[in-house]
Amino acid sequence: MAEAADAATLTRKYKYFYETECPDLDHLRSLSVANRWLETEFPLADDAKDVARLSGAELEFYRFLFAFLSAADDLVNVNLGDLSELFTQKDILHYYIEQESIEVVHSRVYSAIQLLLFRNDAVARAGYVEGALGDPAVRRKVDWLERRVAAAESVAEKYVLMILIEGIFFSSSFAAIAYLRTHNLFVVTCQTNDLISRDEAVHTAASCCIFDNYLGGERPPPARIYELFREAWKLSASLFGCAPRGSHILDVEAISAYVEYSADRLLAAIQLPPLFGTPPPGTDFPLALMTAEKHTNFFERRSTNYTGTVINDL
């Protein structure tokens, strides 16, 4: 087991060459590299025609949702830099470099979709996003994260928070976007959503892996972990209090059940019993499960209706 990651970690002897020290993280990095993609490969402008097909309440909800995702993605990027500095194992450092690279793509995709939802009115988009970040549902999540990170008594607790951001906060949003596909809306946006959700599955798996194997056995008490999971679940549910009532697109109940299932799956990944006991979603659930377990190539389900060329498409 590796030494605990703390301020003293960086004082260990640094190796000026590469050798495999963390084969599990090396595998996840290789999986991510093999499935790199760029925002320029997807003609998001093709979805512009669908903006008018949303009701006023649905359009407001998806504008709000993408404002939240963009803000949350930036918070993850800030935390990545802090976490990567805690380790000297090059497999972990290389993995985080790869994750930061794909997070840039996610950020650019979210920005393009936001602009699409405002019919390319950049001024309106900027004003809306600034206001949305002050919305109580978003503010509670951001404040909770900042407060919990500041109060975290250990690196292990910070990793629990990362697992919750990537595995709980994001998963409900990805599911809400995936429901657009069931009505043949925003087809290209849904393609990018599939890829982003798969990327985040790898990122969550990496956080669980580091938590389990590279923190020197340091773990918060189970009661503390369950407390954080309950809080994250409650906050995720509150965000969907903004969902339009009577929408023919969204199934909020199914999304809520999916979040509970995701929480139980993440608890299993860090060697803890389930909290909710919720079964996996049915085959009619529109989002491919956020899991990296099959280690398949992410592009196997990818449509060819985009610009650019996929190289090394296994």
From Swiss-Prot:
It is found in: Host membrane. It catalyses: a 2'-deoxyribonucleoside 5'-diphosphate + [thioredoxin]-disulfide + H2O = a ribonucleoside 5'-diphosphate + [thioredoxin]-dithiol. Coiled coil: none annotated. Fe cation 1 binds at residues 73, 103, 106. The keyword Ribosomal protein does not apply. InterPro entries: Ferritin-like_SF (IPR009078), HSV_RIR2 (IPR034715), RNR-like (IPR012348), RNR_small (IPR033909), RNR_small_AS (IPR030475), RNR_small_fam (IPR000358). Its cofactor is Fe cation. GO terms for biological process: deoxyribonucleotide biosynthetic process; DNA replication; release from viral latency. One of its GO terms (molecular function) is metal ion binding. The chain crosses the membrane at residues 160-180. Ribonucleoside-diphosphate reductase holoenzyme provides the precursors necessary for viral DNA synthesis. Allows virus growth in non-dividing cells, as well as reactivation from latency in infected hosts. Catalyzes the biosynthesis of deoxyribonucleotides from the corresponding ribonucleotides. Heterotetramer composed of a homodimer of the large subunit (R1) and a homodimer of the small subunit (R2). Larger multisubunit protein complex are also active, composed of (R1)n(R2)n. This is Ribonucleoside-diphosphate reductase small subunit. It comes from Bovine herpesvirus 1.1 (strain Cooper).
